[in-house]
Amino acid sequence: MNLSIFSAIIFSITIASSAIPISENYVSWSSDSNCLDFDDSRDPNAVCEATTTWKRSENSSCIVSVYYVKKEKSSGTSNGIPQCSKTPCDATEKIVVDCETAFREKLANINH
């Protein structure tokens, strides 16, 4: 097969696949945290932050849910209340919702 024909076929497949909407099975899950040793820290000014992002297809739309929590030793026991959002992927502003709404059964998978 000629290299230019092969390249054209690969290019056509790439263009066609980029136009395919996100699959119902699409899932992206990421977590970032510096809270691992927070509870054991003796530093009275210790601070930790944790974020989990879940990107998926829901009712044929791309949705991204974000879980964010910040804990500060100096603020006492009432800090560290998570803030969550559930927003369409193409939106410019996050839509704040309760964490149960944003993560449903996946909320139990978040360990911060």
UniProtKB/Swiss-Prot annotation:
<dbReference type="InterPro" id="IPR009981">
    <property type="entry name" value="DUF1505"/>
</dbReference>
<feature type="glycosylation site" description="N-linked (GlcNAc...) asparagine">
    <location>
        <position position="59"/>
    </location>
</feature>
<keyword id="KW-0732">Signal</keyword>
<keyword id="KW-0325">Glycoprotein</keyword>
<keyword id="KW-0964">Secreted</keyword>
<dbReference type="GO" id="GO:0005576">
    <property type="term" value="C:extracellular region"/>
</dbReference>
<protein>
    <recommendedName>
        <fullName>UPF0375 protein R05A10.4</fullName>
    </recommendedName>
</protein>
<comment type="similarity">
    <text>Belongs to the UPF0375 family.</text>
</comment>
<feature type="signal peptide">
    <location>
        <begin position="1"/>
        <end position="19"/>
    </location>
</feature>
<dbReference type="Pfam" id="PF07403">
    <property type="entry name" value="DUF1505"/>
</dbReference>
